[in-house]
């Protein structure tokens, strides 16, 4: 048994593979379709897509869950990802990642609004998630004191990227870029995550 997390990746990952970030959505959707077919279609079969070509696809053993394992979509707030996850053909769990609580609430409300207003159904609580760093200490103060240097290193060193590498031109639609900046104000800071 498993829960699958399907992520599009970030702009820098496409650059490192010599690919345009502007095609990240179509590559992601095609890869999703390939994985779903591999999980649900009797093999072997050939897959011929625009970006992926396989003469022989045959997953064995097949997943235990039917029709396939649950899929969660981690995201930083791309409107296209929210709409794709909420689509009635999917109804995948939307997982907001590394965001302050107020931004999480806004993006999860957006998922509910899209499900209701665009697709005509009420999103269930099980379709909404928040991936937040958690550290447990003897007291809240001790936990913050012990965790802060590690979280600061994670956000300020390991995830430190210039905007053009993190969100290069074409990676987000203009409406998603404006939405992320409006609700998150750029990259999350450690202090805003402590609440």
Which residues does each PLM region occupy?
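A general structural motif
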Residues: 73-78, 166
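A conserved active-site cap/scaffold subdomain adjacent to cofactor or substrate pockets
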Residues: 77-108
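A local structural motif
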Residues: 66-70
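Acidic/polar active-site rim loop that often engages polyanionic ligands
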Residues: 7-19
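An alpha-helical appendage that flanks or caps ligand/catalytic pockets
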Residues: 23-62, 102-195
